[in-house]
């Protein structure tokens, strides 16, 4: 069976000469949950952004769902991302909207009808344990609850792939375990989950595959 995602000798160099990734070759199968570890600046975030076509490789090839990210037309990127749920640190919660409306936003953008959207939003909130908070203002949520809100927004369109960049950063160990349990619950129903983290507690306690990066290279 072909891999869901494959990197073949991928490098990424930014303007100014900084090489974030160097000769990365790896395969990811459908249904895996993988933790990407490494120091700050190791290349974890860049790798995830390449998968979502937020960045493009400088050299090498990346195949995601049989599509070559390096040659993918700009007009095709929204279709690729319909199958990807993304949680990045720079994503912002909209504090002028309640929890329900925050999760509804991706469905409004893609043109879902109101009834279907409402059903999907409540299903996503239920999955992350926030259904009783749907009318709450985000400012009233705890740090862990805000991260659950971001996860619900990422999965409301029911993607087959979920990528999360440092999702437990700035959370205490109990909240971090809760967030990891949410990701595992999605993985248990077949969603491929890719998480970048340098959270030692998560890395030491996981039973899932760990891929370590150091200065842009895979650690053997």
Task: Describe the function of each predicted region.
Residues 15, 69-85, 188:
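ABC ATPase NBD coupling module
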Residues 60-68:
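Conserved ABC transporter NBD signature motif
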Residues 162-165:
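Catalytic Walker B motif of ABC-type/P-loop ATPase nucleotide-binding domains
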Residues 156-160:
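A short, proline-enriched helix->beta-strand linker immediately N-terminal to the Walker B motif
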Residues 52:
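Helix-to-loop junction immediately C-terminal to a conserved catalytic motif
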Residues 137-141, 145:
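Conserved ABC ATPase signature
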Residues 37-39:
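The feature captures the beta-strand-to-loop junction immediately N-terminal to the Walker
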């Amino acid at each position: 069976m072909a891999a869901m995602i494959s990197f073949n000798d991928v490098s990424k160099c930014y303007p100014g000469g900084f090489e974030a990734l160097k000769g990365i070759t790896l395969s990811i199968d459908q249904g895996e949950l993988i933790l990407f570890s490494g120091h700050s600046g190791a290349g974890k975030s860049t790798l995830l952004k390449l998968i979502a076509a937020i960045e493009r490789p400088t050299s090498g090839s990346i195949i995601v769902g049989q599509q070559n990210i390096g040659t993918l037309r700009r007009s095709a990127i929204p279709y690729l991302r319909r199958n990807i749920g993304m949680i990045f640190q720079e994503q912002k919660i909209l504090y002028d909207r309640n929890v329900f409306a925050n999760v509804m936003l991706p469905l409004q953008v893609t043109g879902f009808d109101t009834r279907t959207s409402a059903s999907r939003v409540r299903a996503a909130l239920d999955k992350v344990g926030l259904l009783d908070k749907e009318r709450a203002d985000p400012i009233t949520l705890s740090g862990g609850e805000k991260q659950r809100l971001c996860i619900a927004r990422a999965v409301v369109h029911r993607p087959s792939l979920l990528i999360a960049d440092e999702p437990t950063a700035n959370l205490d160990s109990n909240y971090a375990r809760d967030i990891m349990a949410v990701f595992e619950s999605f993985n248990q129903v077949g969603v491929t989950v890719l998480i970048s983290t340098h959270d030692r507690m998560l890395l030491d306690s996981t039973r899932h595959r760990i891929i370590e990066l150091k200065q842009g290279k895979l650690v053997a």
